[in-house]
Design a protein with these regions (language model features):
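N-terminal leader/auxiliary helical segments
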Residues: 1-87, 93-298
Length: 298
């Protein structure tokens, strides 16, 4: 990722900045904000035995094909579909901007790690980013902030058809309405369960993990108010793209967030301009790997 709250706040900021000619395609906030969580929702989609996870597929496979299929689906004029696609593009932009930094940081921390802490460092970094952006943009602690989306805000029928038609022949055979609805419900319930209204839940889960000598995997997902600012590169130290060390940046998380917002606005506008003009999507814009941030095949 970035994680849940970061994607939500990013999508809210993008909505404020979309030009009116593009903003008119976002008529449904529920679908837009679900789209802002991208393929993360479908890590909880139950595939048939032997089939690869749908969330992983959307992050790593046939990215350009999925966007081209989205473009075709948008021709229906269904506001649920166009709103979801706009949100999905914010997720794409957020991931391709933030993920190279997160993986660069993980590589450095792994090199420096003394071995005393065992857990999901990736999740902890992104959870702390969530807490940081909630404090910065909402002026709340993560204990006070509640993810606003509910299942009743979403038309799953339209989105099911979109996903069924957009994920390729091998995958679409395994996209089923009941499983689709269940994945959306699970995603919302799962993140509500992770919400820690007092700070006590994280302490309890962490303590239980410690007692039974198991990695701090689940507790890493629960937001904390006392986040670790060393994860944010506020001092603007240089870092490299892990998959292309010729790309060197000094961006901290504030600069990355701003870049993700501007890239989201640019890509959403470009997508709907292509829809109106009947032109194909630019490959280099819509074919980047969600984890590396680099053009697939580039």
């Amino acid at each position: 990722m970035p994680s849940l709250y970061t994607h939500q706040i990013l999508a809210e900021k993008v909505m404020e900045l979309l030009p009116e000619r593009t903003r008119r395609y976002v008529t449904r906030e529920g679908e837009y904000f679900l789209g802002a969580q991208g393929g993360d929702v479908f890590y909880l989609y139950k595939m048939r035995e032997g089939q690869k996870n749908l969330g992983k597929y959307l992050h790593r496979k046939n990215v350009y094909m999925v966007f081209c299929n989205f473009l075709e689906a948008a021709r229906s004029g269904d506001g649920c579909v166009t709103s979801y696609i706009a949100g999905y593009i914010t997720h794409y932009a957020g991931d391709i901007v933030f993920h190279p930094y997160v993986y660069s940081l993980l590589n450095r921390l792994e090199f420096e790690d003394t071995g005393n802490w065992k857990g999901n460092r990736h999740a902890l970094i992104e959870s702390d980013m969530d807490s940081y952006f909630v404090r910065k943009y909402k002026e709340l602690t993560p204990h006070e902030y509640k993810y606003p989306l509910s299942y009743s805000d979403i038309s799953c029928e339209s989105l099911f058809r979109l996903m069924e038609d957009s994920t390729g022949e091998r995958t679409k055979r395994n996209v089923r309405m009941h499983a689709f609805k269940t994945a959306v419900k699970r995603f919302i319930r799962y993140n509500r369960w992770l919400h820690d209204g007092t700070g006590g839940k994280k302490k309890f889960v962490y303590g239980t993990e410690k007692l039974f000598h198991i990695p701090h995997t689940l507790s890493s997902l629960i937001h904390r108010a006392d986040y670790d600012e060393s994860y944010f590169n506020l001092e603007r130290a240089p870092w490299r793209y892990p998959n292309d060390d010729s790309l060197v940046f000094t961006d901290g998380v504030d600069e990355l967030f701003d870049r993700a917002v501007s890239e989201s606005v640019r890509l959403i506008t470009r997508f709907f301009d292509c829809l109106e003009n009947g032109t194909p999507l630019e490959y280099n814009d819509f074919s980047k790997h969600f984890l590396t941030g680099l053009v697939i095949g580039g």
